Amino acid sequence: MNSQWLEGTVRHRRKYPVQHEFSYSTGMLALDTDEWDTVSGVSPLFSLERFNWISLKRRDYFRPDTGDLSVAVRDHVEEATGWRPDGEVELITHPRYFGYVFNPVSFYFCYRSGERPADGVVPKVIVAQITNTPWHDRHVYCLETIGAEPNQAGWRTERFGFSKRFHVSPFNGMNQHYEWTFSFRGPDLRIHMNVLEGDRKHFDATLVVQRTPLNRKDVHRSLRKFPLEAFKVVAGIYWHALRLKLKGAPFYSHPDKLPEDDSAYRRGHDDSGLDVTSSETNDKIRGRVSSWRT
C-alpha cells in the first residue's frame, strides 16, 4: 500500500493588528487516490462511504459529481497546466471522525511516473482545495513547481507567491497576498504560509509532519493519540475566533455580501484559470499559480 499516515504539529501566529498564537499536535491521512476503494481495508475502524471511527466520503473532495477522485484531479491538472499527472496523486487530508469532517485545506500532490512520495520527491503540481467556515465555499489554487535542488540539509523547497482570491477568515481581508513554502526531505514534510498586506505580515501558519506506515497497528495507535481530530479542528477555529474578537481584531464581511462593484466582491468570482502569481513578493518566490472557482 502506498498510502501513509502523517503525524506532527500545526502552528498559527497572528501578527497584526492583534497578536495571537497557538499550536497543537495532529494526525492526517496521505492517501494514494488510486487506493480510494481499498484503503479502508487497513482497519475495521476505517470505512468508505459509511459511518465509522474514521471514514472517507467522495463528496468531501474535489469535484464530487465527477466520480473517480484520481481522474478528477488529473483532468483538472491537465486543464490548468497542460500536463496530465502520470504518477501518484496523493491526497493530504483529515478523514471523517464519527461522520464529521472539516478540512480548511486539503492538498493533492501530483507526481511523475515512478516517483515515490516517501522518498521526499517534489511533486510536479500541487492542487490546494480551500474550504471556509461557516459558509463551506470551496476554491482551488493550482501550483506548478520548478523542481528545486536539495540544500545542504537535504530539503527540497518550493516557493510560491500569489494574490488572495478567496474569503477564508472574517479576520482577514481580501486585499492580501500569500507566500507558500513546501519543503520535502525523505519522510518529512513542511508547509508554511505567510499572509501579507503590502509589506506587512498579518498571519502565518506552519504544518510539520512525518510520514508513518498506514497499517492496522499504526492506525489504531494514531486513533488513540488523535481520537477526535476533525472535532478538534473546527472547535479550535471557533474558540480562537472568539479570542480574536475579544482582542479587538477587525471583522471583514463575506465578499458576497458586498456591492458587486467592490474590489473584494470581484476577487475570485470569475476565476477560471486566472494566473494569480504575485509580483509583490521577493525574488526567491517561484512557481506559477492559477486560481479556480469551484
Spell out what each predicted region is.
Residues M1-T294:
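Mature, function-bearing regions of proteins
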